[in-house]
Amino acid sequence: MFVFQQILFSFETKHDYMKRVGQLSILITFAICVFIAIGCHRKTIVESESANIIETIKIDSSLFQVGPCEPSICISPINTDIVVAGSILDKFYFSQDGGKTWNISRLKSTHGVYGDPVIRMDSNNNIYYAHLANPTGRAYQDEEFLNKIVVQKSTDLGKTWNNGTYPECDSIKDHDKQWLYIPDGTNEVLMSWTEFDKYASKDTKDRSRILFSISDDGAETWSPAVAISDLEGDCIDGDLTTEGALPIKTADGSIYVSWSFDSKIYLDKSSDGGKTWGVDKVIATQPGGWTFDVPAIGRCNGMPIIDSDSSNGSHKGTMYINWADQRNGVEDTDIWLAKSTDNGESWSDPIRVNDDAPGKHQFFSWMDVDPSTGYIYIVFYDRRAYDDAQTDVYLAYSKDGGQTFINQKISEKPFTPNTNVFFGDYNDISAVNGIIRPVWTVANGG
């Protein structure tokens, strides 16, 4: 029965999974945690291990089977004491002491607030919170569900929020899995996401594609959404669906978007501010695809994360892409990184980030590159110490442009997830001026 359930879950969409587990009656302790290095003085544990004390701070917890999870986090680029975060379905977290204590509130909008939170800040301390739409409040029972991607903005550190804006798009179709990028020192907000003709449809005529839009006035208005992926996928929300689009903008003004499709990682480039796009480039393979099974995780996501080095260091301009896959077997999920030193024209062979012996699972990675140092930080779940589903959280960091990584366990104790609980699709990490704040989900019980 256990094996059957694992196979069954592989074919469930994310939203089907959320509906099913939300109807179960089980006792689960859910928590969102953030890693703090106490007494950092603008240095983190990874820069001076002996001078700091690791502490895991619980931001939020719940007995609800669908959340809080899918945390997103951002350190203010101008005041590292200010840290903001979000989680499904509508939670907003605010800290003004570097993440030691948190205030919790909920977003509201007439467009509906329904998960997939992405939270980012600009250089004026404005906060942007992107999420899925649920305008009638009836979610899966209404055709207007997922009819756009909404970005709400706060200009007073989360005390108040506008109702949200959104790019012009086809509201008959479904819109999901967005991400934001805010170039330093600008009013620009970049957003990419997946458009489904009909989410979860098995009809081969229904297709998926990657869309992009940009705002040049702090998310007040948006350019019309444009399709940038040359190949379209299915709508099943699996490896044959075009998903996991992340945008970045590099120092020369070029915009890049990466995503996964059909066991490959794709990259597209625009040199005119997102108006026109080039031919999609395959920059890495992803054997086993971006969605795969890990024991006790009903759905595991290995979608790629792209970033670049905007520091003045020796690796300035280098682009990085990070992902997870099962190229070494279904019992050996690993974390990978590839890099480009020629503006995305060519990419290195994959570099294995986790430094354990083969045969254990590492999964759910997320990456950030500190713009002040160029150091790379990757957070992920790790089972190297166990023969069962017990799970730790690790931070890997590189000071040499991704050539080598040091791995450090940052969770205080392991947890064991439950297959009947929606665990989300991602965690997050933010790195600014040597301050590192990874955030992750913990689930115990059942």
Language model features by range: what are they?
Residues 13, 29-31:
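Ala/Thr-enriched low-complexity intrinsically disordered regions
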Residues 43-446:
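C-terminal PAP-associated
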